Amino acid sequence: SGISGPLSCGRNGGVCIPIRCPVPMRQIGTCFGRPVKCCRSW
């Protein structure tokens, strides 16, 4: 929760992926507003 930018996404072990996260990953926040998701594989 509270992940809303690329810096906090990366700090939490995530990567920024447009539109939606691929299947093994789960969304933990957003990066550049809602269209870009912050995704993590664990």
Curated annotation (Swiss-Prot):
One GO molecular function term of this record is: chemoattractant activity
Extract the Gene3D superfamilies matched here. Antimicrobial Peptide, Beta-defensin 2, Chain A
Name of the gene this protein is made from = DEFB13
Q: What is the purpose of this protein?
A: Has bactericidal activity. Active against E.coli ML35 and S.aureus 502A.
Is the Secreted keyword given for this protein? yes
Q: What is this protein called?
A: Beta-defensin 13
Expression by tissue: Neutrophilic granules.
Which GO terms of type biological process are on file?
cell chemotaxis; defense response to bacterium
Which coarse location class applies to the principal site listed for this UniProt protein? secreted
* Source species of the chain: Bos taurus
Q: Name one GO cellular component term.
A: extracellular space
Family membership: Belongs to the beta-defensin family.
This protein's record includes keyword Magnesium: no
A Pfam match is Defensin_beta
S-S pairs:
9-38, 16-31, 21-39
The protein's UniProt keywords, in alphabetical order, are: Antibiotic, Antimicrobial, Defensin, Disulfide bond, Secreted
Subcellular compartments: Secreted
